[in-house]
A protein has these predicted regions:
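Aromatic- and kink-enriched transmembrane "portal" helix at the membrane-lumen/periplasm boundary
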Residues: 110, 156-179, 207-213
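Juxtamembrane segments of multi-pass membrane glycosylation machinery
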Residues: 110-128
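Transmembrane-helix motifs of polytopic, lipid-linked glycan transferases
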Residues: 129-153
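Membrane-interface junctions at the ends of membrane-embedded or membrane-associated helices
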Residues: 188-200, 233-247, 334-339, 387-398
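Membrane-interface alpha helices of multi-pass inner-membrane proteins
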Residues: 200-230, 248-262
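Membrane-lumen/periplasm interface segments of specific transmembrane helices
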Residues: 249-327
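Membrane-interface helix-loop-helix junctions at transmembrane boundaries of multi-pass membrane enzymes
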Residues: 329-352
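Hydrophobic/aromatic-rich transmembrane helices and adjacent perimembrane loops
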Residues: 368-389
């Protein structure tokens, strides 16, 4: 798809790309939908990058355009700020100021280039927001169908903490959120069939693969934690043992990690073949940077807490947290369980994975706290789901 993307070129695509970049430039680099809430911040800087990369027009060889992630960044003109110059789309050929961004797949290029032929950017934003809303409703309906209605408050609140309007309107955030919701829906609807056909670890590997292909390292762990929590919840309604569920959950985590890592290594390998040593050197520098701490003045733990505080520092979110905790406490009191289901403790796995991810990639989590905090919303979901699974209603399912 990356190769065929640049064969798509229409006047409408160029016009819509130019209008979109102009609009984002007018809005500023990082506007907030709700003032003071970093969770509602839109990353217009990266959205401009995505649009200029997807709609790039050049006379470069097709392979180089497909794997370099080229865009045109014009220098500031008289009386023009750096941001105004950056938020300018150019379809001049040959492009005088090409900037490569080769470490990512830029898998969005084909779809976005095609969609820009049909829709203006604002129409596309509304369609993405609708797609997210539709998948959210589908996931909730499937949770009811599979007898997981007790998890709906935990699921809804955890997703709400990610600021759904920002997820739907921001080009950078849309791929991960849509893939995560689609994975949840497929798992809820087709879990027995997936187990018999491809196998659940392979299904999770495909999730990791597609996230890596379409995402620019935003909050990919959401695509693991949310489906994994639903899988654990589904399995606690069967007769699977603690050991059997532990093995299954771990294999799914390994599958996701392998799919994610192998897709990235494939990109690096192709970079080497197409772009030579320069492409690999750029990737190596970024790996070292992202695995470093956020700076000498901030420990990894400080950066983790800063990400958590995107949610916990806001009064509105604290009220919601207290309301959910009160609801969960009332649930436990009403059920008065005589014994607990120990398999629910496996929710510690999707709770810990986002924490470990944030600690490992602390440089990235420090630079981009306003969206990397969303990785931890999977941990919120696991924490909120724990009481419901520890003391479940006994309605076994196949």
């Amino acid at each position: 798809m990356s190769l065929t993307a640049f064969l798509i070129d229409t006047p409408a695509m160029r016009e819509h790309a130019e209008q979109a970049v102009d609009l984002l430039g007018y809005e500023s680099a990082s506007p907030e939908i709700v003032g003071g809430f970093a969770s509602s911040r839109l990353d217009n800087y990266t959205a401009v990058l995505i649009l200029k990369t997807a709609a790039y027009i050049g006379d470069d060889p097709l392979l180089r355009m497909a794997f370099s992630g080229l865009r045109t960044d014009l220098p500031p003109q008289e009386d023009q700020t750096d941001w105004e110059a950056y938020a300018t789309y150019s379809d001049a050929v040959p492009s005088p100021n090409n900037v490569p961004y080769s470490r990512y797949w830029h898998g969005y290029t084909f779809a976005l280039r095609l969609l820009l032929c049909l829709f203006t950017f604002t129409n596309l934003q509304m369609l993405l927001l609708f797609a997210q809303t539709a998948l959210l409703l589908l996931t909730v309906l499937l949770m009811v169908r599979r007898g997981l209605q007790q998890l709906i408050p935990a699921f809804a609140v955890s997703w709400f903490f990610m600021s759904p309007p920002a997820l739907g309107l921001c080009l950078q955030s849309a791929p991960v959120s849509l893939i995560a919701l689609l994975a949840c829906s497929l798992l809820l609807a087709l879990k027995p069939a997936l187990s018999r056909s491809v196998g659940l670890p392979v299904f999770f590997a495909l999730i990791g693969l597609f996230v890596n292909y379409f995402d620019l390292l935003t909050f990919p762990v959401v695509s693991l934690s949310f489906p994994l929590i639903l899988l654990i919840a589904l399995e606690t309604k069967t007769t699977i043992s603690f050991g059997g569920l532990t093995r299954e959950a771990l294999l799914c985590c390994v599958g996701w990690a392998l799919g994610y890592a192998c897709m990235w290594m494939l990109k690096w390998g192709l970079n080497f073949l197409v772009l030579g040593q320069d492409g690999i050197a750029a990737v190596g520098d970024q790996i070292s940077l992202r695995l470093s701490a956020g700076g000498e003045s901030h420990s990894r733990l400080d950066i983790l807490l800063r990400n958590i505080r995107i949610v916990t520092d806001k009064t509105a979110y604290r009220v919601i947290l207290l309301a959910v905790l009160a609801l969960l406490l009332a649930l436990l009191i009403r059920r008065r369980p005589r014994r607990f289901d120990g398999r629910a403790l496996l929710l510690l796995l999707p709770l810990l994975v986002p924490v470990l991810w944030t600690l490992a990639l602390s440089n990235h989590a420090s630079d981009h706290t306003y969206f990397t905090y969303r990785n931890l919303c999977g941990a919120f979901f696991a924490l909120f789901a724990l009481p419901a699974l520890l003391a479940p209603d006994r309605t076994p399912s196949p």
